[in-house]
């Protein structure tokens, strides 16, 4: 970390397989990566570009049990304990895993920071509060073009801020 900033590398976890994702993370670490943001696949990757959306859906088709991803991420943490992990999780994936299991998984995988993405329809912001009550820290996302209102709101939360590219997918 330098002056409060970390370069965070993104890894679309699970594509082409959870095991291949672990090996790719090992390569990232060998090249100097010390901070990875992983995502868990979702059936409704509405914020993702077509490429990531397709990779998530293909991954879930090949490996439908979310336990496979959780186990692989825990194995990754055991292998690369020096690499800080954070996680992006959509509401439907979180609900499928369940809070108790999710909290246990995050503790085992050394994950403290989570980008929680509520579903578009009927978004349940209370789930974000529940994640925080369970000891996790939410990342505050701000679009790359830095809209002033969103930047001010993100700064006011006191949360770590994640600069997001806007999806250009269809």
Name what the model sees in each region.
Residues 34, 112, 159:
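Receiver (REC) domain switch/active-site residues of two-component response regulators
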Residues 6-21, 84-98, 139-146, 167-170:
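Active-site mouth loops of central-metabolism enzymes
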Residues 1-81:
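Conserved N-terminal beta1-alpha1 strand-loop-helix module at the mouth
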Residues 1-3, 29-30, 73-81, 104-108, ...:
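Acidic (Asp/Glu)-rich catalytic clusters
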Residues 79-119:
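Hydrophobic alpha-helical segments and helix pairs
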Residues 18, 42-54, 61-74, 94-100, ...:
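Active-site-adjacent beta->alpha loops and helix N-cap segments on the catalytic face
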Residues 154-170:
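Active-site rim beta-loop-alpha module in soluble metabolic enzymes
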Residues 37, 114-115, 139-140, 162-164:
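Conserved beta-strand positions in the central sheet of alpha/beta enzyme cores
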């Amino acid at each position: 970390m330098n002056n409060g900033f970390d370069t965070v590398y993104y890894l679309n976890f699970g594509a082409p397989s959870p095991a291949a994702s672990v090996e790719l993370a090992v390569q990232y670490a060998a090249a100097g990566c010390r901070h990875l943001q992983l995502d868990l696949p979702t059936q409704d990757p509405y914020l993702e570009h077509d490429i990531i959306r397709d990779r998530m859906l293909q991954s879930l088709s090949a490996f439908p049990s979310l336990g496979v991803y959780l186990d692989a991420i825990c194995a990754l943490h055991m292998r690369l304990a020096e690499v800080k992990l954070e996680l992006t999780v959509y509401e439907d994936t979180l609900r499928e895993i369940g809070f108790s299991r999710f909290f246990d998984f995050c503790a085992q995988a050394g994950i403290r920071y989570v980008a929680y993405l509520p579903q578009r329809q009927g978004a349940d912001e209370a789930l974000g509060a529940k994640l925080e009550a369970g000891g996790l820290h939410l990342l505050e996302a701000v679009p790359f073009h830095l809209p002033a209102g969103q930047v001010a709101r993100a700064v006011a939360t006191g949360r770590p801020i994640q600069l997001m590219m806007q999806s250009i997918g269809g």
